[in-house]
Amino acid sequence: MKRIIIIGATSGIGLEVARCYLKDGWQVGVAGRREEELEKIRLSAPGQVCTQTIDVTREDAPFSLEQLITKMGGMDVFLLSSGIGKQNLSLCPDIELQTAATNVSGFIRMVNAAYHYFEQRGKGHIAVISSIAGTKGLGSAPAYSATKRFQNTYLDALDQLAHMNCRY
């Protein structure tokens, strides 16, 4: 059975992607911050879903990913769907910094952990939900736009490391 881990699967695009993979018969690892939502997903497909509470802004997030990989007996596909974005016309520093903490620092933590896992295995797939905002800034959400541009450029750079059998 193929195995996918989705970070940020408790709502939105991540949750819908998890549902699609479950319908296709995959074993799905779902992770996010909200334990009650993770439990709902697990109960919707017992035996097919593994869960792990992960906050990508925490330094121990890669360790939590390792725990989920172990629970699942491995990982074939990694999807990062966690991210935040708020309109911030007043440029409140707290909003900008929180956005960067999740969409840059958390992104690096999780993508690098998945990259190293697949590098050791010699194969695997990494996917990230980014945004069209990464191609042209949104004046109402400067940090969001900048962090999505960062993600796109980072993934382009990782693609240059394609000497291993890992796709992005």
Task: Give the label of every model feature segment.
Residues 81-87:
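Conserved NAD(P)H cofactor-binding loop of Rossmann-fold oxidoreductase domains
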Residues 136-142:
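Active-site loop immediately N-terminal to the catalytic Tyr-X3-Lys motif
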Residues 111, 147:
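Active-site helix of classical SDR
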Residues 10-11:
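Conserved glycine-rich cofactor-binding loop
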Residues 45-60:
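Rossmann-fold cofactor-recognition segment
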Residues 88-101:
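Short alpha-helical oligomerization interface
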Residues 131:
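Residue(s) in the substrate-gating loop at a strand-loop-helix junction
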